[in-house]
């Protein structure tokens, strides 16, 4: 694999592309969609691993990319939105790739106002690897 740059992906105007909504102030959650901020985040074992604190958006392709969590113990980590199931009516976010206790070990960022290309790889790899290795029974063959 190739190591990606320790710099953020940029928009055509030279701004960091993926940022929290506290930076991209013109983004908002539409009224008909649940706002995940404040919702507890549950792992595949249904144990709470943290609370959603912020939404990270893509300025170039307007969509949510990550949820910023305060993991158990206070560490701030990102969760790819593609691996999160926001259950608005239940008021929880469910994640099948890792256990509740594993959120606190997710990679951190140098700055919580942007994410570098290398940091994106680390964050996505952490949760993606959990699909195969988060629990002992996932690490063994099915046969």
Give the label of every model feature segment.
Residues 1-143:
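Peripheral interaction segments used for macromolecular assembly
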């Amino acid at each position: 694999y190739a190591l990606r740059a320790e710099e953020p992906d940029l928009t055509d105007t030279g701004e960091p592309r993926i940022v929290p909504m506290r930076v991209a102030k013109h983004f908002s959650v539409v009224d008909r969609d649940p706002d995940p901020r404040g919702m507890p985040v549950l792992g595949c074992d249904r144990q709470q691993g943290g609370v959603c604190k912020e939404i990270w958006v893509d300025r170039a392709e307007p969509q949510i990319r990550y949820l910023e969590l305060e993991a158990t113990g206070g560490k701030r980590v990102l969760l790819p939105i593609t691996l999160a199931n926001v259950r608005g009516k239940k008021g929880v976010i469910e994640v099948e790739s890792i256990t509740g206790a594993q959120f606190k070990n997710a990679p951190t960022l140098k700055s919580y106002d942007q994410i570098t290309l290398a940091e994106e790889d680390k964050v996505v790899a952490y949760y993606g690897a959990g699909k195969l290795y988060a629990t002992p029974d996932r690490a063994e063959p099915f046969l």
